[in-house]
Regions:
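Hydrophobic alpha-helical connector segments
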Residues: 66-94, 144
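Amphipathic C-terminal alpha-helical segment
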Residues: 125, 145-162, 177-187
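Amphipathic alpha-helical packing segments from all-alpha helical-bundle domains
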Residues: 88, 105-131, 138-143, 166-180
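Amphipathic alpha-helical segments used for helix-helix packing
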Residues: 86-106, 153-161
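Generic hydrophobic, amphipathic alpha-helix propensity
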Residues: 3-11, 28, 53-57, 61, ...
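Hydrophobic recognition helices of helix-based DNA-binding modules
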Residues: 53, 57, 61, 65, ...
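Helix-turn-helix
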Residues: 6, 10, 14-48, 52
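Alpha-helical DNA-contacting segments of helix-turn-helix folds
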Residues: 15, 49-57, 99, 108, ...
Length: 189
């Protein structure tokens, strides 16, 4: 592992443990066993390190999504993708919060854009089957993202207790019922 890779790995660990608000380059340097000039040589600034860490976090998120076994059924695939998205936030809430904060600031992160394209592809597959229950694929993708993000935020803000699984499932089911028309039953002749 190169010094740069080690600094990135330690930065991600620090973000997962403490969150972005408590992020400290001094702590990252100490944990990585390097001096501050080494960090600045590789990343230029604390924000440069944070930006690189967010890019790496989104890369890991995207790799997790790409590695998942996805059902050939579009609705099931959308459910799986939704569960994976929310699961990432549940597993890594502080890191997820930092990632979304970057997106909300308008930072362009190619892996985040590619993850959105995966969602768009899942919605397009539902539309291709004639099962889209909304006026457009864009509206359906926006709804899926917004409700998955809301469920993910329940994990991020869970200071005292984890969110009730029933609430997470209800959010997902609402999104799926709105996005997908019910399956047509085949008539026996």
């Amino acid at each position: 592992m190169t010094t740069r890779e080690k600094l990135l790995a330690v930065a991600l660990q620090a973000l997962e443990k403490e969150g972005e608000a408590q992020f400290s380059t001094r702590a990252v340097c100490a944990l990585a066993g390097v001096s501050a000039p080494t960090l600045y040589h590789h990343f230029g600034s604390a924000d440069g390190l944070l930006s690189a860490a967010m890019t790496e976090a989104f890369r890991q998120f995207l790799e997790r999504k790409k590695a998942a076994v996805i059902s050939p059924d579009p609705e099931t695939a959308l459910r799986q993708g939704w569960d994976d998205y929310v699961g990432f936030a549940a597993d890594r809430p502080r890191l997820y919060a930092a990632m979304i904060a970057r997106v909300m600031l308008g930072v362009r992160i190619p892996a985040a854009e590619e993850a959105r394209q995966l969602l768009n592809h899942q919605i397009a597959a539902i539309a291709a089957e004639g099962r889209l229950g909304m006026s457009s694929s864009d509206a359906a993708a926006d709804l899926a993202w917004a409700i998955a993000h809301a469920a993910a935020l329940l994990h991020v803000t869970a200071v005292d207790r984890k969110p009730e699984p029933e609430v997470i499932a209800a959010l997902r089911d609402y999104a799926l019922q709105t996005i997908c028309k019910p399956r047509q039953k085949k008539l026996l002749t």
